Amino acid sequence: MQIIVPHLKSKACHGARGRDRDQQDGQGCFSDRREKAARALVAWASTHPAPASTAGTLITGDLNSYARETPLTIFRNAGFSSLVHHFHPCTDAGCPQTTYRYKGRNGTLDYALASDSLMPLVLGAWSWAINAEEPPALGYRQNASPASPWRSSDHNPVIVDFAL
């Protein structure tokens, strides 16, 4: 499989100018930059030469975009599916699997997106709840003791199980 690991621009507004400023559409700052990056990734993935034996493409990383934001719409329209949401769908009550917490609210900014051709090989996917739920006081930005559990990121990792 072809694996692409992007980290799209943060929603934080430091240094945002022009179209990178918060457009008040719920996507935060730098949404234009994330949209352009998503379009470039889709274009690159569709033209990047891969051996005929390649099963498909996995785009996995911190996309700094919630599921209904423009970058995820671009990936969906290009035939990529969020694996965690495929196996653990959201309901009106919320999403059972999340990767980030901001001001006490859970959400997903990190994804494993599979191309249609890769989907038959995916056995499962989930968010490993080891970071976002932990208080920042137990985090990597403090002097955490390596002898005890500590928050190593502000995001939870996404795990995917494949039948290869």
Model-derived segments and their meaning:
Residues 27-31, 65:
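Short, surface-exposed loop/turn motifs that are enriched in glycine and acidic residues
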Residues 24-28, 144-145:
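A general, composition-driven signal for non-globular sequence regions
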Residues 8, 62-63:
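Active-site metal-binding loops of divalent metal-dependent hydrolases
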Residues 3, 58-59:
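Beta-strand elements within well-structured catalytic alpha/beta cores of enzymes
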Residues 1-24, 164:
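Beta-strand-turn-beta hairpins that frame and shape the catalytic cleft
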Residues 35, 45-58, 64-164:
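Metal-dependent phosphoester-hydrolase catalytic domains
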Residues 30-38:
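Phosphate/oxyanion-binding active-site loops and adjacent basic polyanion-contact surfaces
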